[in-house]
Amino acid sequence: MDLHIAGRKAIVCASSQGLGKACALSLSREGAKVFINGRHEDKLRATAEEISRETGHAVVPVVADIMTDEGRAKLVAACPDADILVNNNAGPTPGKFEDWDHAAYIAVFEQNFLPAALLIRALLPGMRQRQFGRIVNITSAMVKSPRAHQGLSTAARTALTALCKAISTEAVVDNVTINNLLPERIDSPRQQYLIERQAKMDNIPVEAARQKLTDTIAAKRFGRPEEFADMCTYLCSEQASFICGQNIQLDGGSYRGIV
């Protein structure tokens, strides 16, 4: 299937590793010119070269911290006419409600709400004017299945979800869609960090902690980053123009709800 992405310009945030990198690779395979982003120049340039070698398409590394006004401005300046925006950033460390103070809430909104919201604000008008745009926010399964220890992440990502639902109803008339991908149990560096953290808390080997978590997944395996990334790429296609304002779970069937 031709997704009609070839030649499109795509910004993928926090894409030197993990799910961001997987999404950048998938989009590049379809012929998009991808602008990848991260804070560490050497790592980012190596990722750009790796993806470009594999796909044969140009990949532009933009070293910038998207949690700052200067970083966001630099990223937008590198690709002011982006057709595709994939919002992504690392999540906060799990913890306890009673330990989260005012500073913790401010920090998580500056990490998982404001960068995406302000990048959308910068790029959405141009997308609407050109009559094409695809915005995908990588959020979290915690949006639909909140857990106490992930309360900080849930608060910020749910706020982003609500904002994007509101603005998506206006943007879609100009062929601009905004959707959210909700990963859970995808085999990424973030997931490995959480496994190692749990192993330490439970005083068990890392592999035992990994198996314990695997047993909770309906599919009895972790998701592959490329599976997640290919869904992201489909949402950026011409064919996905009637999918808008949705929260799409990628969790191996583990979500217990029906809506």
Q: Model-derived features: where do they sit?
A:
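Conserved glycine-rich cofactor-binding loop
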Residues: K9, A14-G18
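Conserved NAD(P)H cofactor-binding loop of Rossmann-fold oxidoreductase domains
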Residues: N88-P94, G253
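Substrate-binding pocket helix/loop in short-chain dehydrogenase/reductase
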Residues: K96-E98, A104-F109, L213
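Alpha-helical segment proximal to the catalytic Tyr-Lys
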Residues: P125, T169-E170, S241
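Catalytic loop of short-chain dehydrogenase/reductase
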Residues: V136-A159, C164-V173, E184-I186
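Short C-terminal tail/terminal secondary-structure segment
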Residues: S145, T233, C244-V259
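Short, small/polar-rich loop/turn modules that mediate ligand/substrate recognition or access, typified
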Residues: V172, T177, I243-G245
